[in-house]
Amino acid sequence: MQIREVILDGESLTIEQVLAVAYGQPGTPVVRLAPIARQRVERAAQAVQDLLARGVVAYGITTGFGAFKDRVIAPDQVERLQYNILVSHAVGVGPVFDIPTTRAIMLIRANTLARGHSGVRLQTVERLLDMLNQGIHPRIPCKGSLGASGDLAPLAHMALPLIGLGEVEWQGEVLPAATALERLGWQPLHLAAKEGLALTNGTAVMCALGVIETARAETLSATADIAGCLSLEALYGTPAAFDARLHALRPFPRQIECAAHLRRLLAGSTFVRNNDPRHVQDAYTLRCIPQVHGAVRDAIAYARWVFAIELNAVTDNPLLFVDDDGNVEVISGGNFHGEPLAIALDYLGLAVAELGNIAERRLMRLTDEASNTHVLPAFLTRAGGLNSGFMIVQYTAAALATENKVLAHPASVDSIPTSANVEDHVSMGVTAGLKLRSIIDNVSQILALELFAAAQGIDFRRQELGSQARLGRGTGPVYELIRQYVPFIAEDTLLHPYITIISELVAQGKIAAAAAVHDDADA
């Protein structure tokens, strides 16, 4: 069901809503503040003004930041302090985030502020949402965050357009934020006390990466099952290892789910061996798909749990607690520390890398006639020597799998002290998220290469089976989808365009969707 409206209250934002806003057109769905959120925001903003009137010393409101935490700011400079944090912290480098990630960042940050513990004014949160709904997207360099105190540098870039600084992308054009505001008839905001800090201090960037990449990993997980089954059919393997009774004796729920998925995909196939005494079991890369892919599903489920919580967390510092009588307490803490997210991102990265490792080994088996016991010709070509066939397809997969082994090294164990050793342990959560994004990109390509080779192998097997050839209930539609765009490769030709096509089918979720239509019951 299409999501047409997202109401932010700081407590109920879902992963599906974030994805709808991230990938939707500006204003579809429209994002608004809930009435309760408006009340909370206004109450906390008034509490900040009360603190100033009483001369209370509070971090980031009447003091400097980081190592300057004990430098008290004069009352007539507190607003300048908030301007200064944006311009001094907007020092990110590297390519800018894509628009879906940028939109997710803006939405998540607004939801955090909507909880009413950060002290920003209502007009500030609403301006951020106005930008989101109008499709005014800040240009946010992707590198520069340590993941504590939150994502300072990228969030400073996100906030710059609120005050008429920085660059935005709007209606397909990159332009100064001031120009975009002028065209809309909007005045730049003058930040009040606490607002610059509240906009920049939090985990919205690593959380946005986590939400988007978790969703991509879910699609890849389903695609990996499909690729594995198509390879098993091409290799004349046996589905005996997917028997429900076997998996019930090792009751990891997602291993059991994966095995059931494989059975549904292969239901009705004549390409597999059943009760063949000459071939009682396959190599690990086929036989152990449920154990490996199931473990990856566990990592994905854990990541989804983490990011579902973080979407509705308040990750600012300090936080304001206002009671029913209007009394306020300011508490300095560490909710900005991204360790829970960084560990989840690292965990998901190494898990998804395993999908690529096992897929590359299946691809090797498809191309090596010795490994596949001559079920398929060497490198999937009849005229080997004159033709190289799929030889270098496997090389590319091997290169990508090897790159992922480097990328899978965890970022979260590699803290580095900053701010004169005041901020002496950091999470490196955005680094973990960017690595995860690269791993997922690579695995998407590896699975495309496996599907390309498996479809080629199926055609060789089809020649052998003749009129008896029938693919599984789930694998058959996927094979047909591939063959709509990519032919059987009878002799050497330029393969790259075909790889690009299948890669797009994988990335767009069309491979998973083709099988899912036929995945409505257990086998």
From Swiss-Prot:
The modification 2,3-didehydroalanine (Ser) is found at residue 149. It is an enzyme of class 4 (lyase). Pathway: Amino-acid degradation; L-histidine degradation into L-glutamate; N-formimidoyl-L-glutamate from L-histidine: step 1/3. GO terms for cellular component: cytoplasm. Keywords: Cytoplasm, Histidine metabolism, Lyase. SUPFAM superfamilies: L-aspartase-like. Gene3D superfamilies: Fumarase/aspartase (Central domain), Fumarase/aspartase (N-terminal domain). Contains an active site 4-methylidene-imidazol-5-one (MIO), which is formed autocatalytically by cyclization and dehydration of residues Ala-Ser-Gly. The gene is hutH. It holds the Pfam family Lyase_aromatic. It is found in: Cytoplasm. Its EC number is 4.3.1.3. GO terms for biological process: L-histidine catabolic process; L-histidine catabolic process to glutamate and formamide; L-histidine catabolic process to glutamate and formate. It catalyses: L-histidine = trans-urocanate + NH4(+). GO terms for molecular function: histidine ammonia-lyase activity. Belongs to the PAL/histidase family. There is a cross-link at residues 148-150 (5-imidazolinone (Ala-Gly)). It comes from Chloroflexus aurantiacus (strain ATCC 29366 / DSM 635 / J-10-fl). The keyword Lyase applies. InterPro entries: Aromatic_Lyase, Fumarase/histidase_N, HutH, L-Aspartase-like, Phe/His_NH3-lyase_AS. This is Histidine ammonia-lyase.
